[in-house]
């Protein structure tokens, strides 16, 4: 009993350590580049001074620049609230993501707290996140990549638990996971496509095995709707007309393939470890 309590203490100490470390890193990072643009109502040059301005800027951004409505809203909101509050929120998001990855790995909320696994995940995130400062600390970058990953990880957690036979059916759950699916699918493009295809595959698998429950396709449709909202934003086409002038469709596809191949190099050690441990 005493040993279990000590394990819990170490586990929570690791959580607090990661939060404090990330808070200090965020505290040291000043506003930079795009942060100044997003501190203002989009394309107006006027500073955001109210919640109404936050909504107005997000709306203008959606129609003039891109479809990332959730992450842009969060960025505008916390830049208006102030750097201190942003630093706290960003540190919480990073800590939450490590916790969510931990629960995905354990596939159970009730299993023993494993300090070593949690600490290893924190270290792996530090070493393997591509361009760590840009995606986990810089405000305009972290809201796009880190903040979109958290709702996606929450959204996919019930699917992981259900496939592990550790998640019960809940009558109230379909509308909840439908909304989570919208935020997961509408966060950032590559993650939105991933969560949509993954939940589609899980829905099909459960249907074939005759274990399909109502919340499973509900999440898929939510993710699909979020992805459509993200990709069909008028701002995407406005930006493409400006930035994509003189470039063909296949040129953009080639850039994406090259970019994702680069990302694989960052996580290659993790992939090799997984293969060696026969987890994939």
What are these regions (language model features)?
Residues 88-97, 142-155, 196, 264-269:
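Membrane-embedded alpha-helical segments of multi-pass membrane proteins
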Residues 26-72, 76-81, 88, 139, ...:
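Transmembrane catalytic cores of multi-pass membrane glycosyltransferases
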Residues 152-172, 209-210:
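Membrane-interface transmembrane helices that cradle and orient dolichyl/undecaprenyl
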Residues 117-160:
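Membrane-interface micro-motifs in multi-pass membrane enzymes
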Residues 172-189, 195:
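Membrane-interface alpha helices of multi-pass inner-membrane proteins
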Residues 108-120, 169-174, 211-220, 280:
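Membrane-interfacial loop-to-transmembrane alpha-helix junctions, especially the N-terminal start
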Residues 91-116, 154:
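Transmembrane-helix motifs of polytopic, lipid-linked glycan transferases
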Residues 1-21:
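Start-transfer (signal-anchor) and selected internal transmembrane alpha helices
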């Amino acid at each position: 009993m005493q040993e279990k309590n000590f394990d819990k203490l170490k586990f929570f100490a690791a959580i607090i350590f990661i939060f404090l470390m990330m808070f200090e890193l965020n505290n040291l990072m000043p506003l930079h580049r795009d942060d100044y643009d997003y501190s203002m109502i989009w394309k107006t040059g006027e500073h955001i001074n109210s919640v109404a301005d936050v909504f107005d800027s997000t709306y203008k951004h959606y129609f003039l620049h891109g479809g990332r409505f959730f992450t842009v809203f969060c960025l505008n909101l916390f830049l208006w609230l102030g750097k201190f509050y942003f630093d706290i929120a960003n540190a919480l998001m990073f800590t939450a993501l490590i916790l969510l990855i931990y629960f995905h790995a354990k596939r159970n909320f009730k299993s023993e707290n494993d300090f070593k696994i949690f600490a290893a995940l924190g270290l792996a995130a530090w070493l393997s996140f591509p361009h760590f400062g840009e995606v986990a600390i810089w405000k305009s970058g972290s809201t796009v990549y880190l903040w979109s990953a958290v709702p996606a990880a929450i959204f996919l957690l019930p699917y992981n638990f259900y496939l592990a036979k550790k998640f019960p059916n809940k009558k109230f759950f379909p509308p909840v996971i439908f909304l989570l699916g919208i935020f997961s699918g509408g966060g950032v493009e590559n993650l939105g496509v991933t969560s949509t295809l993954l939940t589609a595959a899980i829905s099909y698998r459960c249907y074939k095995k005759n274990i399909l429950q109502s919340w499973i396709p509900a999440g898929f449709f939510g993710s699909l709707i979020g992805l459509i909202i993200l990709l069909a934003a008028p701002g995407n086409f406005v930006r493409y007309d400006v930035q994509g002038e003189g470039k063909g469709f296949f040129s953009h596809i080639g850039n994406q393939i090259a970019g994702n191949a680069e990302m694989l190099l960052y996580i290659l050690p993790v992939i090799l470890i997984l293969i060696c441990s026969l987890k994939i």
